[in-house]
Structures are given as C-alpha cells and as structure tokens.
Amino acid sequence: MAIAKSVRARAVGLRSLRVLCAQRSVAREFSVLNRPQPNYPGHIPLTPIERGALAIGSAVGSLLNPRRGDLIATVGETTATPFFIYRLRDAMLADSTGRRILRDRPRITSQTLSLPYLRNLPKNTVGYTYATWLDREGVSPDTRSSVQYIDDEECAYVMQRYRECHDFYHAVTGLPIVVEGEIALKAFEFMNTLIPMTGLSVFAAIRLKPEEKQRFWSIHLPWAIRSGLASKELINVYWEEQLERDVNELREELNIEKPPDLRDIRKKVREQKKAAKEAVIKS
C-alpha cells in the first residue's frame, strides 16, 4: 500500500514537473527577449501584458491629444483582438464583395488611385467627392500607417482596409477632419463596425468646447447612431469600383444619411460671433 502511494506521488510529481517545464518553455518561446517570427512584414508580436499596457497607454495619450493619429491607430489594433477584428473579417467572408476584397487585397494610396483623374470626374461622382474632400482638408491617402500588432495576417489586412477606407467615409458623409468631425465619424463607424477604438474615441468629446459638445450630443451623436445602425457594412464596399458612380445614389444604396454640414455650421457660428462683437464695438 505504501509502495503504491509512493508510486502515485512520484507520478503526480513528474506530471507537475512536465507542466512546469512546458510553461517555462512557452515563456522562453515568447518573451520580451525571445519573440516568435513575425507573421507578415512589419508585424510585431506582443505578449498579453504588452498588448494591454500598450492599449491603455495609447488610449490615455490619444484622449489627451485626439490629433495623435499614431496613438489612435495603436489603440485600434491592440483592442481589436481577439474578437472584434475577427467579427469584421467574418462579415467580409459572408459577403460576395467582401470575399473579393479579401482575395484581391487592394490598397488605397495615391499610386493606386489617380487623384488628377478623380478631380476631373463629374461633380456628382464618388471619385470627385473623394478627391475634392482630400483637397479641402489638406490630407493624402498615403498617411495611413501600416498595421503592426494584429497577429493574424488576414485580419491585419482587414484592419488596414478599414484604415484606408476611412477617408471615403469622411467624403460621403461630408464630415471634416476637425476633432468635432472626427469624433462624429468615429461614433458612426462604431455603430457600423463595432471596432472598440471607434467607440472609445467618443470619450474625446469631453475635451470639446461647450458649443461643440452641445452640437455633438444633440446633432451628430444621434445621427451617428441612427445612420451607423441603418447603413450596410461599409467594410464590404469596393470603393475602387464605385468612383464613377453618383455619390447620392451610392449613399441611398448603402443607406447612409448625410449629416448637417459641420463646416457650414461652424462658419455660421463664427460669423454670428463676429457680427455680435462688431455690434458691441459700435455701440
């Protein structure tokens, strides 16, 4: 009996030793000083602790400075896994156009899109709307950083695609890149994509001026919820094939409601303030 107990104890001890060795082996396989090979060019594998720390630090930094696009991009990547980016990928796999996009892997840059050509399209087209929006806002499709922190190679492309399509969302909604406009668009994107970063961006509204907050809560947030939920999955739009289409026709097809022109609203507010100031001076 004593011998049997001794044998069982030794067996348990050996199993525990094997588990401990396996855990140490895994730790050696993936640690700060010993990372696995990247899954695609530019990929940086992260441990769960590193991912969490990077997500929190980037979220705080982007909240303090909403113009830090690099921090916002990092928050997007580190909070999209393990569930949300797979949900978006699965939405593409469930759609015929989404599957084509995943197969073709198109990229949106100034090399893949001829901006001079788009500027000469009829004014009611998607391409003209996109190009003139870029010109008005002074931005370029080449400013989108490459995905680094998503482990799955296909999901990394999905995030890259979302990132490069962001300016098309701006163009068809007409929202400018001022902080107020970015927050409104991020709220719209959250309702449409469920990417956590887009929802977290709404907290940046606390840094808006009082009149901007009032507009956001009363006009643009209700619009974002309403339109974001009603519209089709925008990740499945093959924008490169829509450039010559009527932009209003595409909005109707995608069920996108265009919000009130934010630049026009801000301009009128400035003019009213200027007129009121001049009236005080004259009096």
Swiss-Prot record:
Q: What is its EC number?
A: 4.1.1.130
Q: Which family does it belong to?
A: Belongs to the COQ4 family.
Where is this gene product found?
Mitochondrion inner membrane
Question: What is an annotated GO biological process for this record, any one?
Answer: ubiquinone biosynthetic process
Q: Which UniProt keywords apply?
A: Lyase, Membrane, Metal-binding, Mitochondrion, Mitochondrion inner membrane, Transit peptide, Ubiquinone biosynthesis, Zinc
Give me the reactions it catalyses.
Answer: a 4-hydroxy-3-methoxy-5-(all-trans-polyprenyl)benzoate + H(+) = a 2-methoxy-6-(all-trans-polyprenyl)phenol + CO2
Which is a Pfam family this sequence falls into? Coq4
Note the superkingdom of the native organism: Eukaryota
Q: What pathway does the annotation place this protein in?
A: Cofactor biosynthesis; ubiquinone biosynthesis
Q: Which InterPro entries match?
A: Coq4, Coq4_euk
Question: Source species, please?
Answer: Coccidioides posadasii (strain C735) (Valley fever fungus)
Cofactor dependence is on: Zn(2+)
| Name of the protein | Ubiquinone biosynthesis protein COQ4, mitochondrial
Binding, Zn(2+): 166-167, 170, 182
Keyword Methyltransferase, does the record have it? Answer: no
Q: How does it sit in the membrane?
A: Peripheral membrane protein
Gene Ontology cellular component annotations, sorted alphabetically: extrinsic component of mitochondrial inner membrane
Q: Please give the subunit comment from the record.
A: Component of a multi-subunit COQ enzyme complex, composed of at least COQ3, COQ4, COQ5, COQ6, COQ7 and COQ9.
Record function comment: Lyase that catalyzes the C1-decarboxylation of 4-hydroxy-3-methoxy-5-(all-trans-polyprenyl)benzoic acid into 2-methoxy-6-(all-trans-polyprenyl)phenol during ubiquinone biosynthesis.
Transit peptide: first to last position: 1-25
Where are the coiled-coil regions? none
